Amino acid sequence: KRKYNLLVGERTAEQIKNEIGSAYPLDKPLTMEIKGRHLLEGIPKTITIDDSEIRDALSECVATIINALRVALERTPPELSADISDRGIVLTGGGALLKNFDKRIREETGLPVSIAEDPLASVVLGTGRMLTDFSLLRRIAIE
C-alpha cells in the first residue's frame, strides 16, 4: 500500500504473506503478481512484487515478536533457561508458518529453533493440556 499506492483485501494480503513472505532472506527469490485498486487513480491495477518487499513490509512485526521473545527469555527462571539452551525454542501458531522465521530467531538469539510438526494445532493442544494439568503451567510460569 505504502510503496505502490495499491489497496488489497485481507485475503489477498494473507495470500501474499503465505506465498512469498519471509522473515529472513530466501535461498531462491520469489515474485508474485498482485491485483488491487490503485488509491490515487481509483482503478484496478496489477503489479509484480518480490519476497524482499514483503519481508520489508513484515519487518516491524517480526522485530516486535523477536523483542517480546527476548524479554521473555530475560525473565525466564534459570532452570528453564538451561532447558531452552539445550532443547531450543519450538515455534507454534501461525507465525511459525512464515518462511525462515526459525532462521531469523536462531540468528537473533543464538539458540536452536525448530517448528512444531503441526504449528496451528499445537497451540490448541498445548492450551488444552495446560488447562487440564495446572502443574505443567506452574513448572514454566514466569513471575
Regions found by a protein language model. Give the residues of each.
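Acidic, glycine/GT-rich loop-and beta-edge segments that sit at the periphery of enzyme/chaperone cores
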Residues: 6-9, 13-14, 129-143
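Conserved phosphate-binding/catalytic loops in two-lobed NTP-binding clefts
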Residues: 103-128, 137, 141-143
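Charged, alpha-helix-enriched surfaces in structured cytosolic catalytic cores
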Residues: 3, 7-11, 53, 57-60, ...
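Phosphate-binding glycine-rich/basic clefts of nucleotide- and phosphate-handling proteins
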Residues: 1-59
